[in-house]
């Protein structure tokens, strides 16, 4: 239903990328098209180029990494998606798994952080700043009777401009936690505290 270009490509003219989206949309292969991992200006450029011609496929979504550990999209991408009225999809809302708390006491042997293939993906979020945020999420979870996963997902879900979060589960327990997060609401005082500890 939704086909997104994975990332901006400096080697490919933007018009070629957008033409590929048009082809998928107009042929019925995709009901909606979007962009992923574009900066604010790149997003605005792609969206407005498509809007200039009524027969072009409208950009429906942008997808970027967003979590308590990475709030960079709040500077440009979220304001862009809100101003241009397109959906925002947050990928890695659990901060590459770190916000679940599983790395608090080290790197579990069965985790992505222990995998030679994914260690470099997780490692940037194993620093002191991230540790402070993970501890704050744990304190909030303990106080509210939720899991850290539920707190982190609820925070992303309710962030201004977020349409949805892209989540993945390897186990039934993870899936249940993800689904439970839809049933909770974080008190404003907790949101404010998490905003403060995770601000840049």
Language model features with spans:
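Short hydrophobic/aromatic patches at helix-to-coil boundaries
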Residues: 199-200
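Acidic/hydrophobic-patterned starts of short beta strands in beta-sheet-rich repeat architectures
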Residues: 2-3
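Beta/alpha (TIM)-barrel catalytic core signal, keyed to glycine-rich beta->alpha loops juxtaposed to Asp/Glu
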Residues: 9-196
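Histidine-centered active-site/metal-ligand motif
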Residues: 6
